[in-house]
């Protein structure tokens, strides 16, 4: 098991060597990984691609996938690639898409053509202030106790 996402919120199965993996015939989110420093940091992985599928067995794994050449180029060898996957219990396609977008925003995987920015911009809904979001209006000093 490997945890991915903001605050490592998703428990993915794997990582497993991609060359020997038989994907399940189920929907899921998957990430392609490699070890950037296998000799010194064998337990550290880098995320190079994230996607989702309605049926993981139809994604043309391991090396007929449309982005496989990018994966191999990044890892240096097809046998240095790893895969991990997440089945979203009760999750719809829209849930898998949201998880995929979040992971792409967090890791910025180089083999994904689409990238997402998790930043918030005031112009999206307008700037606002609320009295509950401001500083406390009491003259009591919290460091002195009750």
Model segments located where?
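Boundary/linker segments flanking structured domains
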Residues: 1-146
């Amino acid at each position: 098991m490997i945890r991915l996402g903001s605050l490592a919120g998703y428990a993915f199965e794997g990582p497993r060597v991609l060359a020997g993996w038989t994907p399940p015939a189920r929907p899921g989110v998957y990430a392609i990984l490699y070890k950037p420093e296998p000799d010194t940091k064998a337990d550290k992985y880098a995320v190079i691609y994230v996607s989702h599928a309605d049926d993981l067995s139809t994604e043309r794994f391991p090396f007929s996938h449309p982005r496989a050449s990018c994966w191999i180029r990044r890892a240096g060898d097809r046998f240095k690639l790893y895969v991990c996957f997440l089945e979203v219990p009760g999750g719809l396609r829209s849930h898998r898409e949201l998880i995929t977008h979040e992971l792409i925003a967090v890791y910025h995987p180089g083999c994904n053509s689409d990238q997402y920015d998790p930043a918030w911009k005031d112009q999206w809904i307008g700037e606002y202030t609320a009295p509950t979001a401001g500083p406390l209006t009491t003259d009591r000093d919290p460091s002195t106790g009750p």
